[in-house]
Amino acid sequence: MHIKSIILEGFKSYAQRTEVNGFDPLFNAITGLNGSGKSNILDSICFLLGISNLSQVRASNLQDLVYKNGQAGITKASVSITFDNSDKKQSPLGFEVHDEITVTRQVVIGGRNKYLINGVNANNTRVQDLFCSVGLNVNNPHFLIMQGRITKVLNMKPPEILSMIEEAAGTRMYEYKKIAAQKTIEKKEAKLKEIKTILEEEITPTIQKLKEERSSYLEYQKVMREIEHLSRLYIAYQFLLAEDTKVRSAEELKEMQDKVIKLQEELSENDKKIKALNHEIEELEKRKDKETGGILRSLEDALAEAQRVNTKSQSAFDLKKKNLACEESKRKELEKNMVEDSKTLAAKEKEVKKITDGLHALQEASNKDAEALAAAQQHFNAVSAGLSSNEDGAEATLAGQMMACKNDISKAQTEAKQAQMKLKHAQQELKNKQAEVKKMDSGYRKDQEALEAVKRLKEKLEAEMKKLNYEENKEESLLEKRRQLSRDIGRLKETYEALLARFPNLRFAYKDPEKNWNRNCVKGLVASLISVKDTSATTALELVAGERLYNVVVDTEVTGKKLLERGELKRRYTIIPLNKISARCIAPETLRVAQNLVGPDNVHVALSLVEYKPELQKAMEFVFGTTFVCDNMDNAKKVAFDKRIMTRTVTLGGDVFDPHGTLSGGARSQAASILTKFQELKDVQDELRIKENELRALEEELAGLKNTAEKYRQLKQQWEMKTEEADLLQTKLQQSSYHKQQEELDALKKTIEESEETLKNTKEIQRKAEEKYEVLENKMKNAEAERERELKDAQKKLDCAKTKADASSKKMKEKQQEVEAITLELEELKREHTSYKQQLEAVNEAIKSYESQIEVMAAEVAKNKESVNKAQEEVTKQKEVITAQDTVIKAKYAEVAKHKEQNNDSQLKIKELDHNISKHKREAEDGAAKVSKMLKDYDWINAERHLFGQPNSAYDFKTNNPKEAGQRLQKLQEMKEKLGRNVNMRAMNVLTEAEERYNDLMKKKRIVENDKSKILTTIEDLDQKKNQALNIAWQKVNKDFGSIFSTLLPGANAMLAPPEGQTVLDGLEFKVALGNTWKENLTELSGGQRSLVALSLILSMLLFKPAPIYILDEVDAALDLSHTQNIGQMLRTHFTHSQFIVVSLKEGMFNNANVLFKTKFVDGVSTVARFTQCQNGKISKEAKSKAKPPKGAHVEV
């Protein structure tokens, strides 16, 4: 791409429209007197290219570029340059279709700057992209050498010369970005220090302080809760003591008064007894001789009656047992019959299914035969109407069928001719192409072999990846799962601690009493070792266990002793050693009696309502084995007070019935059940253990997956590289001429095969159509006979179809009857099976009834036997009484003496009780006053009075010793006052905020550190590439530098070398040789020689990265004529592919140019004249002889 013409209008000294045409594609020169406007042409080119530093075009702002700053009536400056774009290799991106590109830039005073490309408005960026794509970046212009550039190069130090090489090699931009990146790293480093300082000096101490304050706050809350709990407990205890004193004093007062009355009654009773005894003694004396044994006879009669009743009940009992055995035998027979019927029923169902399937098959066959009959009837009707059947079964006339055959023959012949022509053409083309493609291109073969090798390597990599058995994204999913598990574990721990904080009694912790302590020896609290089968029984089970729920189960008494002595237990615990505990359990006989009494579903042993490990059997029997649990109060009362049971019983609602004299009940506390909370705690603990095990397993899996993941990533990266390489090779093969020829050959071969197949098919179609036509033609000749034959065939087919349809219909109806019969049999079997079930249920009910009756009768038989035994004993006793009557009379005298002595004792006791009655009256009055005062001071006593002293309640005085609670309360009040002075109530919320800020800063810190690591790695990698590119650039520039300098100064040589003791990367300096003598520095050279050195370096760098256009502005100003002449020759010889526009005042320079432009300043405006020069530098005669050169030679305005 090169400049063809420039149009200037209102630009600097070019007031009028000035066209500068006919630029030479290679060497152009501009000359003229100072101030004539020759440099303004260069300024116009820079202006159009979009220069941003206006000082380089000798202007301070865009208004300075307008002719006389717009004060001469011209308010617009416009520059338009036409570029030759016929060489498409150097064409800008996107402009390959244009042979010429015209770019215009306009600036209007007080208006805006405007660009046009080929007459169309364009923005600054698009113009910059256009010129930058061909190496014409005017804001970094290596193609532009202005006045003073040579002096600047001569004064450069080694690092500055190196920077020019870097600029030429394109690595300078990297250095700028590297410095920017290093500054970014320094900023990030400062940010890291800031984050670290904030973490160390602010957040971490704050978090530590807040954690301590949180601990204090939690301790303060714990103390407050305990004070509240213990205060109520202690006050409740004091209230109970006062109330107990009041009640006890009143009860004891009443009891003593009753005792006085009782003693007085006993005195009176004893007097009566003494009189009665005296009377009995008299009677006994009288009856001693009269009694002859009448009582004995009555007792013997009673014995006989008891024996008769016993025999009768025993007979009835034996009869019921026989009936039960009979029913059980009947049940076995029914069960046997049911099993046999089930087998028969299953066999019959299979048979029904089989016959039903056969019926379906017959129905399908019957339907098909019916359809065939309809088709035969239709065919008969068509033949009767004079129609005939074609090959498709459709009815048509013979003439119509013959016409269709003719069409088929004609179509087949046409297709055959087309296929023959296509085949002939393809065969000829194939022959020609095969002659052209005789051997495979060696480059194609190499690429094909390379592609195969890459594919094999890909397959090998895929096999290795598959062998690793690694799933992509598995590591990320595992990491996400680990984060989720960590969050779940944290949540569960918080829930666990919250439950323990809410219910401190659930916490059981101890210190190992000795080294290598086996924690399996301590089983834990009873409440933690059980699971309640039915949650509705929790209240009852809590009352059954009472304070034993908090007992600690251990394996041996030795373990318990060590735990108590050195376990540092936080509170008092009762120990249950499994090897020593003496457990009792309700006998199975007692349980059966209770179940018979109220029903088996209404009473249970408490032990049966909980689940536990077998090794804890003794401990659980100790806690739950001696109490019944009933569903309601009525059943509980029956069970507890039955003389055969007499066992403590608890209802599901919480009422307790104790046959030894205790009955408790009423409203229960609405607080959460301890066992329910224990179960909730266990569930949380189990889930926490599962999550921790999962996390541990996940950590192990991640550790094992790390190496595999890394190896997989490496193999995947190699595989992707090979895939890209294979795609490139495949594309290259497909774009090669050999591949295209092969594709054409394959297409021709395919065409030949298709044509041959078409020919074969058309011949077959034509043959069949001709044969059919011949048959139809014969039919037409014998139409009447043919019609008769077809009519007979149709009648025959119709009769055959009708016979077949009737037969299949008959078979289907027979099969339907068979199915209906066997279905009825199946239904009968099902009814019999149902009947057996009902009979079996009735037998089971009878057996159950007999068993219940036998159980009752067994009890009655036992009772009758006991009556017989008692009657026998009475008879025996009576016989003994008669023998011992003398002894009784003596005993009566002794009893009279005893009663008299008791009267004396009672009189003494009455005097003592009178004294105590006075004392208890005073105590009862004091207790009543204290109770009244406490009820007035504490409103909550009335609401919670029913819970005072109740087991498993907040006022359980057995579990919590009130005296110890009072002492503990005093200490807690002191702790509360101490903690209250320093506690921070906002510590919890502030700590959460501080921890979030800490985590956020740590995340930012990790991001910054990762960014820094990546940047440093990239810089290190790019530094190596930069050094390689710099060495290549230095060698190329150095070679051209020496060559150009030798051309400019024959017999001399020059090079760029690093300073002594340094490398190329440290800097470069000039080394010049005149003849065979190398100069130490440039000061030994003349001014002109130094200028040539600098110019040679500039031009050698232009050669390293050639641009389509070069602009030189009086670079020969400091040179003499001989050197100037050499520069011109050098440009002609070294730069044969670029356009040069040179401004010079010396003939030695512009005489070498192919086209010369001369500027003049006429009437305040600049003009331009064009001259074509011969190779010897002389102006053509034609151009000299005319004032105005012909068109194409020069233009003057």
Curated annotation (Swiss-Prot):
InterPro entries: P-loop_NTPase, RecF/RecN/SMC_N, SMC, Smc2_ABC, SMC_hinge, SMC_hinge_sf. It is found in: Nucleus; Cytoplasm; Chromosome. One of its GO terms (cellular component) is nucleus. Keywords: Acetylation, ATP-binding, Cell cycle, Cell division, Chromosome, Coiled coil, Cytoplasm, DNA condensation, Mitosis, Nucleotide-binding, Nucleus. Pfam families: SMC_hinge, SMC_N. Residues 522-640 form the SMC hinge domain. The modification N6-acetyllysine is found at K114, K222, K677, K1158, K1160. GO terms for biological process: cell division; kinetochore organization; meiotic chromosome condensation; meiotic chromosome segregation; mitotic chromosome condensation; positive regulation of chromosome condensation; positive regulation of chromosome segregation; positive regulation of chromosome separation. Residues 173-507, 672-926, 963-1031 form a coiled coil. Its main location: nucleus. GO terms for molecular function: ATP binding; ATP hydrolysis activity; chromatin binding; single-stranded DNA binding. ATP binds at G32, L33, N34, G35, S36, G37, K38, S39. Forms a heterodimer with SMC4. Component of the condensin complex, which contains the SMC2 and SMC4 heterodimer, and three non SMC subunits that probably regulate the complex: BRRN1/CAPH, CNAP1/CAPD2 and CAPG. Interacts with BRD4 (isoform B), leading to insulate chromatin from DNA damage response pathway. Belongs to the SMC family. SMC2 subfamily. The SMC hinge domain, which separates the large intramolecular coiled coil regions, allows the heterodimerization with SMC4, forming a V-shaped heterodimer. PANTHER family: STRUCTURAL MAINTENANCE OF CHROMOSOMES PROTEIN 3 (PTHR43977). Central component of the condensin complex, a complex required for conversion of interphase chromatin into mitotic-like condense chromosomes. The condensin complex probably introduces positive supercoils into relaxed DNA in the presence of type I topoisomerases and converts nicked DNA into positive knotted forms in the presence of type II topoisomerases. This is Structural maintenance of chromosomes protein 2. It comes from Homo sapiens (Human).
